[in-house]
């Protein structure tokens, strides 16, 4: 576990060095693409310290979104068998089965990973397709591949509650 954190920190430092070396300006904040602009790529960035908002234009723009788990209103904060992505990366022990809520890129990556380790995986998605931010044909190919591997996919499924199993 500590080794994986050390490697991640080393890679992160290396990327920062390469960006600086190649004179890439990095803005730490919250950004979104301006949908009104079609010819020029424009991004609006609110800096992390909330001091100001910038409008940036560039030929090439990279938005590194990062990842953060979302609190779900129907999940008890004292639930002991509910993991966020950090726990899923370094589980206390390998479960025999796992339900993954959400089929975005991170959820599907965990589904594949745990399936490869022999865990029975079910993915639950509220929308009608997995990987809802991707092209439909990509979603269909991934769904077909995952089903062949034994991953259960439940789309159009809304969770109402999650409880601890004792």
Residue ranges of predicted features:
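Glycine-rich active-site loop/strand segments that organize a redox cofactor
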Residues: 1-3
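Rossmann-like dinucleotide-binding cores of NAD(P)H-dependent redox enzymes
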Residues: 6-12, 16, 89-90, 95-99, ...
């Amino acid at each position: 576990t500590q080794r994986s954190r050390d490697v991640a920190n080393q890679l992160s430092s290396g990327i920062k060095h390469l960006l600086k070396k190649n004179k890439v300006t990095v803005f730490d904040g919250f950004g979104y693409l301006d949908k009104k602009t079609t010819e020029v790529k424009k991004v609006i960035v609110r800096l992390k310290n909330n001091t100001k908002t910038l409008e940036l234009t560039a030929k090439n723009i990279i938005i590194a979104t990062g990842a953060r788990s979302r609190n779900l209103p129907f999940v008890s904060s004292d639930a002991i068998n509910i993991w966020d992505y950090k726990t899923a990366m370094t589980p206390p022990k390998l479960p025999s089965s796992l339900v993954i809520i959400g089929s975005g890129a991170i959820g599907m990556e965990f589904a594949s990973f745990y399936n490869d380790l022999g865990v029975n995986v079910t993915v639950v998605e509220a929308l009608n397709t997995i990987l809802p931010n991707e092209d439909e044909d990509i979603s269909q190919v991934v769904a077909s591949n995952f089903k062949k591997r034994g991953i259960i996919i439940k789309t159009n499924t809304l969770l109402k509650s999650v409880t601890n199993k004792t």
